[in-house]
Regions:
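Short beta-strand micro-motifs within the conserved protein kinase catalytic domain, predominantly
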Residues: 47-57
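Short pocket-lining segment of the protein kinase catalytic domain that shapes the ATP-binding cleft
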Residues: 59-67
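Active-site acidic catalytic loop and adjacent metal/ATP-binding pocket
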Residues: 1-3, 7-8, 167-220
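Residues forming the ATP-binding cleft of Hanks-type serine/threonine protein kinase domains
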Residues: 11, 52, 64
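Active-site activation/catalytic loop segments of kinase-like enzymes and analogous catalytic loops
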Residues: 218-270
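A conserved alpha-helical element in kinase catalytic cores
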Residues: 6-49, 77-90, 220, 229
C-alpha cells in the first residue's frame, strides 16, 4: 500500500510431491534467522520480514535497483573492491555470533559443511578411476569452443589438473583436513552475489536467503564468496588470506564428480 514495494517468496505446495514440507521449512527458517539478526546485526539483513498465508509466503523489504541497489557484482573495479571488502568484513563479523545449543537446534543451524564436503569421496573416485578422469576431460574439452576466453582458460586448468594424480592426491589430503576443522563460526552458508544487495552510494550491504545458515569452520563464508567473485571474473588476489584452503580443496572433487550426472530436467522441485 502507499506505493511500497516488497519482495515475496511463495511455496506452492500443490507442485511438490511432499506438500512442500521441506520448502516451507526453508521459508520459516529464513524468516526466523533474519529476525534473530535484526536484533544483533540489523545493518546486514532485511529491515522487515514476515510470514503469511500459513507459512506459504515470505515477505521482506525490497532493495530495488531503481533505489540504487546492486544484485550483481559491480562492473567498476574500484566499486567492486569496496563491494568485496564490505562482504568480507560482514562475514567476519557474523562469524562471531554465539548462540545457545537449544537455539541452534530450534533454528536448524547445526553444522553440515565439513561432513558434506570434507568427507565426500568424489575426489577419491576421480583419483582411483581413469575412466572417470577421461570422461571429465572429454566433457571439459567439449565445453572449450563455446566459452569466453576466461572460461576457456579455467577449463584448460581443470583438464591439466585431471592429468596430474599427484596434485589430485594433494587436494584429497587437504579436503580430508577440512573434515577435521571445528565448526564454531556462524555462517550464511550461501554467500554469493545473487544473495547480496549492495548500495554503492551508501555502502550498505544486505544478505538475504538465510535458509542454509549454519555453524561452519572459520573462513567458510569468505571462501564461498571469493569463489563466486572469481567466477564473475574479478581479481580476488588481494583477499587470498581470507580463504579456507582446505574448504576450497573440498569443492574440487565435490563439484567435479557431480558434473558427470545427467542434466537436470523439469520436475517437482524448486532447484
Amino acid at each position: 500500500s502507499g506505493g511500497r514495494t516488497i519482495f515475496v517468496k511463495e511455496v506452492d505446495a500443490n507442485l511438490l510431491s511432499d506438500e512442500g514440507e521441506r520448502e516451507l521449512g526453508w521459508l520459516k527458517k529464513d524468516c526466523a534467522v533474519t529476525r534473530l539478526l535484526q536484533k544483533t546485526y540489523p545493518q546486514y539483513v532485511a529491515d522487515w520480514t514476515e510470514l503469511a498465508d500459513d507459512g506459504h509466503v515470505l515477505m521482506m523489504s525490497s532493495y530495488a535497483s531503481s533505489d540504487g541497489w546492486l544484485w550483481q557484482p559491480p562492473t567498476d573495479n574500484s566499486v567492486a573492491e569496496r563491494y568485496i571488502s564490505t562482504v568480507i568484513t560482514e562475514v567476519r563479523e557474523l562469524e562471531k555470533i554465539k548462540l545457545p545449543q537449544e537455539l541452534i537446534e530450534e533454528l536448524q543451524l547445526q553444522p553440515f559443511a565439513t561432513e558434506k564436503l570434507g568427507l565426500d569421496d568424489g575426489i577419491d573416485q576421480i583419483i582411483a578411476d581413469a575412466d572417470v578422469r577421461r570422461r571429465l576431460i572429454d566433457n571439459y574439452q567439449k565445453l572449450l569452443p563455446n566459452q569466453l576466453e576466461i572460461n576457456q582458460r579455467r577449463c584448460q586448468v581443470i583438464i591439466e589438473l585431471l592429468k596430474k594424480r599427484d596434485e589430485l592426491t594433494d587436494i584429497s589430503v587437504r579436503a580430508k583436513e577440512f573434515a577435521k576443522q571445528t565448526e564454531g563460526c556462524f555462517n550464511h552458508s550461501d554467500v554469493r552475489s545473487d544473495n547480496l544487495a549492495f548500495n554503492p552510494q551508501t555502502g550498505e550491504l544486505k544478505l538475504v536467503d538465510w535458509n542454509w545458515a549454519s555453524y561452519a569452520p572459520k573462513g567458510s563464508g569468505a571462501t564461498e564468496f571469493l569463489v563466486d567473485m572469481a567466477r564473475h571474473g574479478h581479481d580476488v588476489m588481494p583477499w587470498l588470506g581470507e580463504l579456507n584452503v582446505e574448504m576450497l580443496a573440498s569443492f574440487v572433487g565435490f563439484y567435479l564428480i557431480r558434473s558427470l550426472r545427467p542434466p537436470l530436467k523439469p520436475g517437482d522441485n524448486l532447484r
